[in-house]
From Swiss-Prot:
Described function: Produces ATP from ADP in the presence of a proton gradient across the membrane.
Name of this protein: ATP synthase epsilon chain
Cystines in this chain: none
Family (UniProt): Belongs to the ATPase epsilon chain family.
Gene Ontology cellular-component terms listed: plasma membrane; proton-transporting ATP synthase complex
Top-level taxon in the UniProt lineage: Bacteria
Molecular function, one GO term: ATP binding
PANTHER family, alphabetized: ATP SYNTHASE DELTA/EPSILON CHAIN, ATP SYNTHASE EPSILON CHAIN, CHLOROPLASTIC
Cellular compartments annotated: Cell membrane
The keyword Membrane belongs to this UniProt entry's keyword annotation: yes
HAMAP family in the cross-refs: ATP_synth_epsil_bac
Subunit structure as annotated in this protein's UniProt entry: F-type ATPases have 2 components, CF(1) - the catalytic core - and CF(0) - the membrane proton channel. CF(1) has five subunits: alpha(3), beta(3), gamma(1), delta(1), epsilon(1). CF(0) has three main subunits: a, b and c.
Annotated organism of origin: Mycoplasmopsis synoviae (strain 53)
Keywords attached to this entry: ATP synthesis, Cell membrane, CF(1), Hydrogen ion transport, Ion transport, Membrane, Transport
């Protein structure tokens, strides 16, 4: 079976660099799976679950990814992001503490620009919590 070269790069390191069967993640039109020999594709990444390989395979990896960029062609998928974590490595207690702190910040009288930053951080944390809960079912 044909394989696809997946490279996930963050500002500090290469998060993943190997051959895979499929990569699935959320783009602006919804979730999309990337397979070998597919047409070229370029898009922003929406926060959500990134799945490497097929759901029930022994080498499946689930991650939570924040925003980023994806470019794919027939042979490879390249992802650039500054926010990715394996779901199994998510610390739910720490996320819930951060969520509570941000929700308390929202009750303050914040400048509009700061309010937007807090809302975006809270949205990202809620997305990670959702991904964790779906993975742990």
């Amino acid at each position: 079976m044909a394989k696809l070269k997946l490279t996930i790069t963050t500002p500090s390191a290469i998060f993943y660099d190997d051959l895979v069967d499929i990569v699935t993640l959320r783009v602006n039109l919804g979730y999309k799976g990337f397979l070998p020999n597919a047409s070229e594709f370029f898009s922003n990444i929406e926060p959500g679950t990134l799945t490497i390989n097929y759901e029930n395979s022994s080498d499946m990896i689930k991650c939570h990814i924040g925003s980023g960029l994806i470019y794919s062609n027939k042979e490879s998928v390249n992802i650039i992001t500054d926010d990715i974590v394996k779901i199994e490595d998510i610390n739910l207690d720490a996320l819930n503490k951060q969520k509570e702190m941000l929700e308390n910040r929202l009750k303050e009288n914040l400048r509009e620009s700061l309010l937007k930053q807090v809302e975006e951080k809270l949205e990202n944390i809620n997305s990670r919590i959702k991904a964790y809960n779906e993975f742990k079912k």
